[in-house]
């Protein structure tokens, strides 16, 4: 399928694209010259000020230069007394200046050598008297700077060149600026419309470009707008407004615990009403609520706004206050049930490989660009206020594109945020299990379809769909019918992007991908068939925007792992260890099916179920694991206030056992195999269970730790303590070889000690 060039808000760096407009840097990120240009005055920070010089003492009739000359003369006479062979015409000495004649300050002149000699003599005297320690011998200095480069490693030479280049930025004093203006020149420096100095090629100096994406600290913008301006610009028509409409607003919040002084608090439902007092105490200056909320009592806030539709207000107000950042960025939305997070990470890496600074908001966090993480709540991707604020921060830090996970978790049935201007819509797949995400099947489909219905401009928008999913035609038909659709498939050769050949292994995935513009050979650390689908989706996005094929491959291959998503733990062991967040019977089944395709000798699986909820799924989880794993280790996963042994009793029902029957076998330290020949063990302490399972691994096996994924906590009773499955696996792998060398049999649980013990 032919792909037309896109006309995004900020052009992509393709050969046919024009240069993007200069980006305004945060004031605190500008180099000194940039700060001068923006304010026309430079005031160095206090830490940069030099200490004031001492007042010159002229009571003896000699100025500072005359005093210095006398010191030199005394040193000259002392030198002649100690070394008579050195005469005044010796090249060591310079001719003394005649009266009234200015002395030479040439750095190469012997005048400075004599000063150094006088200082050295004084140091020797103090050393002899024991006042100071002897100086260490000075290392020999190379005569030329190139000699230093010969002694450096290639990486150090590159760093040295970078330092020299950045040292070209100098602070310009106010006097220098006035002299330049008086002479009718600007020192050869051109400035952009925003006051930022331009490079020789006309581009704005960017600190992040100079020191690398990982070297620049993220800056957070400040916003200010009166309530009256916000209501006017957002086109929100309130039912009633009481109080001061000229109150200045600095932010918007719906979570009372996040409110800061100057914020507007959006009171949503009973939960919002419960947090109203806290928001008021934290400094909320205005409150927005709907007519169903009964606000009684006296609030310290200065204004109250009543609206008909609080959901619309929740979207419109933050978009307006944060200046609608999506209008100035290329925004890619990824929707679906599975693979959304991995696909978003791959697409972002591909964009950055193209040189497009790209942010992201997803369930694993938010990023301004590169690995520069933003402060965000875990559920930020489903919060319209948080998304607008995070995108504004990305834009403020120079991001040109943004990846948004348009998952149904936290998304209302009305669909994606209508205040976000999407450019590309991507579908991974649709799997609706019962009342998933609190929606019916129709609501679930319409919610994700709302993203594709926004694709109406054939010049700017694109749809990317997985035609192996039965719902693909429904999503492709949404929005404009003339908007290009890029399809991908695992085996369907009619798709624009499809696999030609692939190979799965315990440590790597290799795939040949056919595209309309050529064949791509991709080697990835992401494991399993499902990740091939995610790779295909990313390639399809690259095709949709006309990305260079080499950048598509480079970006995808740079992603070695997605935290907690079939994440490989590699400590150079002879067997695979995978950590995944699968915590439902369906996701566990798909995970183990994918692991089976890797061709392992055995599968050892650790599963746990949370306390105080979803008791019905506990036996089902065990049944799935016992059918698709050779060895199963049952354990706890955030038992909270429920007894972990009660949870394990429920889980054992999945294989027809009770806790009492299991413990009877424990009297002989032998647990018989299940009817299918598979083994099952349990331990209520998760740390013990995870480490025991890792120790069971042998060459060719795969140990799968499920449930937590990238979560880093364990909740027991009322305590929430740090716990990371990945770190537990790495720790256990350090000792497996030692256990085996000691003759300990870790294939059973409890472990079997050698007879010598």
Curated annotation (Swiss-Prot):
PANTHER family: MUR LIGASE FAMILY MEMBER, UDP-N-ACETYLMURAMOYL-L-ALANYL-D-GLUTAMATE--2,6-DIAMINOPIMELATE LIGASE MURE HOMOLOG, CHLOROPLASTIC
Subunit text: Component of the plastid-encoded plastid RNA polymerase (PEP) complex.
Cell compartment(s), UniProt: Plastid, Chloroplast
Biased composition (Pro residues): 12-30
Protein's name according to its UniProt entry: UDP-N-acetylmuramoyl-L-alanyl-D-glutamate--2,6-diaminopimelate ligase MurE homolog, chloroplastic
Family per record: Belongs to the MurCDEF family. MurE subfamily.
Keywords attached to this entry: Chloroplast, Plastid, Transcription, Transcription regulation, Transit peptide
Role: Required for the activity of the plastid-encoded RNA polymerase (PEP) and full expression of genes transcribed by PEP.
Biased composition annotated in UniProt, kind: Low complexity: 1-11
Keyword set includes Manganese: no
Region (Disordered): 1-112, 126-152, 172-195
Biological process, per Gene Ontology: biosynthetic process; cell division; chloroplast fission; regulation of cell shape
């Amino acid at each position: 399928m032919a792909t037309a060039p896109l006309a995004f808000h900020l052009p992509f760096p393709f050969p046919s694209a024009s240069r993007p407009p200069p980006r305004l840097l945060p004031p605190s990120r500008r180099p000194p010259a940039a700060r001068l240009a923006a304010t026309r005055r430079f005031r160095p920070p206090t830490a940069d000020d030099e200490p004031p010089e001492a007042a010159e003492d002229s009571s003896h009739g000699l100025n500072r230069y005359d005093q210095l000359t006398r010191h030199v003369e005394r040193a000259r006479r002392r030198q002649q007394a100690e070394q008579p062979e050195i005469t005044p015409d010796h090249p060591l000495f310079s001719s003394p200046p005649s009266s009234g004649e200015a002395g030479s300050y040439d750095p190469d002149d012997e005048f400075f050598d004599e000063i150094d000699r006088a200082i050295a003599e004084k140091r020797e005297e103090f050393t002899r008297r024991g006042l100071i320690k002897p100086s260490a011998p000075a290392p020999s200095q190379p005569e030329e700077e190139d000699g230093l480069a010969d002694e450096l490693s290639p990486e150090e030479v590159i760093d040295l060149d970078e330092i020299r280049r950045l040292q070209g930025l100098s602070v310009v004093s106010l006097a220098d600026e006035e002299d330049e203006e008086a002479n009718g020149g600007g020192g050869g420096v051109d400035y952009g419309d925003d006051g930022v100095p331009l490079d020789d090629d006309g581009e704005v100096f960017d600190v992040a470009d100079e020191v690398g994406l990982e070297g620049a600290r993220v800056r957070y913008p400040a916003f200010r707008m009166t309530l009256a301006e916000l209501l006017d610009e957002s086109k929100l028509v309130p039912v009633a407004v009481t109080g001061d409409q000229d109150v200045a607003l600095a932010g918007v919040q719906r979570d009372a615990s996040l409110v800061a002084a100057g914020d507007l608090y959006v009171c949503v439902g009973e939960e919002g009403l419960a947090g109203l007092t806290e928001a008021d105490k934290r400094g909320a200056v205005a409150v927005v609520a709907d007519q169903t909320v009964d606000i009684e009592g006296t609030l310290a806030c200065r204004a109250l706004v009543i609206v008909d539709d609080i959901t619309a207000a929740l979207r419109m107000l933050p978009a307006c206050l944060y200046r609608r950042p999506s209008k100035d960025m290329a925004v890619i939305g990824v929707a679906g049930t599975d693979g959304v997070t991995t696909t978003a990470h791959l697409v972002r890496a591909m964009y950055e490989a193209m040189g497009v600074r790209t942010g992201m908001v997803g369930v694993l966090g938010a990023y301004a660009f590169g690995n520069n993480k933003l402060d965000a709540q875990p559920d930020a991707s489903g919060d319209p206020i948080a998304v607008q604020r995070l995108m504004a921060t990305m834009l403020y830090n120079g991001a040109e594109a943004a990846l948004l996970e348009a998952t149904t978790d936290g998304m209302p049935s009305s669909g994606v945020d209508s205040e976000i201007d999407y450019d590309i819509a991507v579908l991974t797949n649709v799997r609706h299990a019962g009342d998933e995400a609190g929606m019916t099947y129709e609501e679930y489909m319409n919610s994700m379809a709302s993203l594709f219905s926004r694709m109406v401009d054939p010049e700017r928008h694109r749809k990317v769909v997985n035609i192996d999913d039965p719902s693909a035609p429904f999503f492709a038909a949404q929005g404009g019918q003339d908007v290009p659709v890029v399809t991908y498939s695992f085996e369907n050769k009619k798709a624009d992007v499809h696999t030609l050949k692939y190979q799965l292994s315990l440590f790597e995935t290799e795939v040949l991908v056919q595209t309309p513009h050529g064949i791509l050979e991709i080697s990835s650390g992401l494991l399993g068939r499902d990740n091939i689908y995610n790779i295909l989706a990313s390639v399809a996005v690259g095709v949709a925007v006309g990305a260079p094929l080499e950048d598509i491959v480079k970006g995808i291959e740079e992603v070695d792992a997605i935290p907690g998503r079939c994440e490989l733990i590699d400590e150079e062991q002879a067997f695979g260890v995978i950590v995944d967040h699968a915590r439902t019977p369906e996701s566990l089944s798909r995970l183990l099916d994918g692991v089976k395709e890797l061709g392992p000798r055995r599968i050892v699986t650790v599963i746990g179920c949370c306390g105080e909820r979803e008791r019905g799924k506990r036996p089902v989880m065990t049944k799935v694991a016992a059918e698709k794993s050779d060895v199963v280790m049952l354990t706890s996963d955030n038992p909270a206030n429920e007894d972990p042994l009660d949870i394990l009793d429920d889980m054992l029902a999945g294989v027809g056992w009770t806790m009492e029957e299991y413990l009877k076998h424990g009297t002989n330290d032998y647990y018989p195999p299940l009817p299918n020949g598979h083994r099952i063990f349990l331990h209520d302490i998760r740390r013990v269970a995870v480490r025991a399972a890792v120790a069971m691994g042998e060459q060719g096996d795969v140990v799968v730790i499920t449930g937590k994924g990238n979560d880093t906590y364990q909740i027991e009773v009322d305590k929430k303590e740090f716990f990371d499955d990945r770190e537990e696996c790495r720790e256990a792998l350090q000792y497996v070889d030692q256990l085996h060398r000691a003759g300990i049999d870790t294939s059973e649980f409890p472990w079997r000690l050698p007879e010598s013990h």
